[in-house]
Each structure stands twice: as C-alpha cells, then as structure tokens.
Amino acid sequence: MILNSSTEDGIKRIQDDCPKAGRHNYIFIMIPTLYSIIFVVGLFGNSLVVIVIYFYMKLKTVASVFLLNLALADLCFLLTLPLWAVYTAMEYRWPFGNYLCKIASGSVSFNLYASVFLLTCLSIDRYLAIVHPMKSRLRRTMLVAKVTCIIIWLLAGLASLPTIIHRNVFFIENTNITVCAFHYESQNSTLPVGLGLTKNILGFLFPFLIILTSYTLIWKTLKKAYEIQKNKPRKDDIFKIILAIVLFFFFSWVPHQIFTFMDVLIQLGLIRDCKIEDIVDTAMPITICLAYFNNCLNPPFYGFLGKKFKKYFLQLLKYIPPKAKSHSNLSTKMSTLSYRPSENGNSSTKKPAPCTEVE
C-alpha cells in the first residue's frame, strides 16, 4: 500500500509500505524482452493487416471494417510499448515525464476496451451473417459498421478517461525513484473500486458472455448444416476454430483481470500483506504480456481465417502491387455455410447453402 506524504515541484511525494514488491531482477530482464517481441511481432502483423485490408481488399465488407479498426487500435498501443519496456528495464523508474505517463497509460486502457468491443462486434456480425443471413442483410451494411466503430472508439476513449486523469508521476521517497502509477487517497474508495469493476465487467465479463453466446449459436447452426451434408471433417475444423477463439480470449484475459482486482484491494488497504503484494506486482506485468500479445495477434489470426486474405497477404510479401479495382471480400471458414430459405418459401424446410463471403 502506498501512503501520501507531500507535494513538491508539482510531483507528489509518497511512501511505499512494500518497496520491494515486484522488484526482481528476472522481471527487469524478462518483461522488457517480452515487450520487445510483442512490439516487433505486433507492429509487423498489424501493419500488414492494415495494408492488405485497406489497399488490396478495398474495405468492402463489414468484417473487414472491424478488423481494420482492431489492427489500428493495436498499432496505437504498440507505439507506446517501447516506453513501458524502458520503464521496466530501468527497474520501474519513469524518465519520460507526466504527460507521456498519462498518454501511455491511456493507450493501454484504450486498447483494452477498443479491442474487446471490436471483437465482440465481430462475433455478433459473424452470428448475424451465419445464423440470420437473409434477415441481417439490410442491417449489416458498411455504414452501420463504420458508425459502430466510431461509437466504439468514443466509448473506449470515455472508459479510458479516468486512467488518463488519475495516472500520474510520483516520487517514492523511501526508494528514491520516480514512478508512473495510480495513487488513491485512503479516504476515497469509490475511484479504485469503480475502475476495477469497470475493467472486470465492461472490459471482460459482458464481452466474453456475448462472444461465447454468439459462437455457440454459430456452432449449433453450422453443426446442423454439416450433419445434413454429412461433412464430419469440416464440422470438426469449424469446432476447433470456434473453440480456439473462445478459449484464447478467456485464458488470455482472465489472469490479468484477476490480478487487476487484487491490485485494487491492495490499493484500498484491504490487503496489507507484503508477500501477497509481491505476488501481485510480480504477476501483473506477466499477465499484461499474455493479454496484449494475444490482442496484437488477433487481427492477423482473424484475417488468416479467410482464403482471400491469405492470397493478398502472400502477394504483399512478394511485392505484387494491389490492382486498381478489386471485388474481393473477406471470407472466413466460419461463414462457409449458412441457412437460406428454400425456394418454395417454406421456412420449416431449409437446406445448407454456400456463403463464402462476409458481406
């Protein structure tokens, strides 16, 4: 727990009750290395996604709009990752000033909410395209997708405002270091509880339930279609993809959400054990690496589910320029089959039909 002491030169001076918590040599070596790997891999992968979707595929589908925005949100976060790598390598000494502390912290929070919201919308879009392909045609338009993305960016920015406002540079007197951190006044318990619960519920629980429900309904619909076609290998492939999407999201974010909640309890003074605080402070950067590495891999992962995305990706690697006119659409293995009403208009008689393009 950190206690307030005084304010000098515009920087609040505080005391740290557990000054050694989370400060281990292997953390100062391992975490910057992982941050560097995430930065290189994420910058490369997400940049290629932006180039392929915008210049090669011409941004013609709803799914491509969500994927493009997902990649852009990741790139915004990745640009601040070198700051966190330096910060950790310098044993949690922040040399970049208060403004960059706020910007970098806000970027992390913004990416969390924007990415999760976009993945949720992408799962809803897949649900509508596969389970209700005819009914959703008029609703799944490019205009609706673009407006939805604007709303998501605004909501993510709004959810990140408390982080930007309350994350500051502090000087810890008993360790003689300057940190970029949250600091809650002991008499104000509303703020940390609100931030923690918002991150847990709005940034994970609700989106996960929507994603789980969407892909469960998608699986049931495709399962019926494959049973009619007696295509068991294809059914198994789709099941593995859906299972991977849901499990990757869950296990990537659950550790970070758990330790975020524990960190709030520490800041509130409800946990006053330095051993527990050491565990939390040590685990937190590891869970951050896990969560945001998965985040930065999401756009390439979802993109490579489409055959045409892979085709244009290979063209890009071979330095083949995009054509002036393209009629390509982003496709995914999960949208290979959908239910369409039979020609006789009997809604109770349905047959599986190919639906390879995400519209």
UniProtKB/Swiss-Prot annotation:
Angiotensin II binds at residues 15, 17, 167, 182-184, 199. Gene3D superfamilies: Rhodopsin 7-helix transmembrane proteins. Disulfide bonds join 18-274, 101-180. Residues 1-25, 90-98, 166-190, 269-278 are extracellular. It is a multi-pass membrane protein. C-terminal Ser or Thr residues may be phosphorylated. The chain crosses the membrane at residues 26-55, 62-89, 99-125, 142-165, 191-216, 240-268, 279-304. It is found in: Cell membrane. One of its GO terms (molecular function) is angiotensin type II receptor activity. GO terms for cellular component: external side of plasma membrane. Residues 335-359 are annotated as: Disordered. Glycans are attached at residues 4, 176, 188. Pfam families: 7tm_1 (PF00001). Residues 335-350 have a biased composition (Polar residues). One of its GO terms (biological process) is maintenance of blood vessel diameter homeostasis by renin-angiotensin. Residues 56-61, 126-141, 217-239, 305-359 are cytoplasmic. Keywords: Cell membrane, Disulfide bond, G-protein coupled receptor, Glycoprotein, Lipoprotein, Membrane, Palmitate, Phosphoprotein, Receptor, Transducer, Transmembrane, Transmembrane helix. A lipid is attached at residue 355 (S-palmitoyl cysteine). Interacts with MAS1. Interacts with ARRB1. Interacts with FLNA (via filamin repeat 21); increases PKA-mediated phosphorylation of FLNA. Belongs to the G-protein coupled receptor 1 family. Receptor for angiotensin II, a vasoconstricting peptide, which acts as a key regulator of blood pressure and sodium retention by the kidney. The activated receptor in turn couples to G-alpha proteins G(q) (GNAQ, GNA11, GNA14 or GNA15) and thus activates phospholipase C and increases the cytosolic Ca(2+) concentrations, which in turn triggers cellular responses such as stimulation of protein kinase C. This is Type-1 angiotensin II receptor. It comes from Ovis aries.
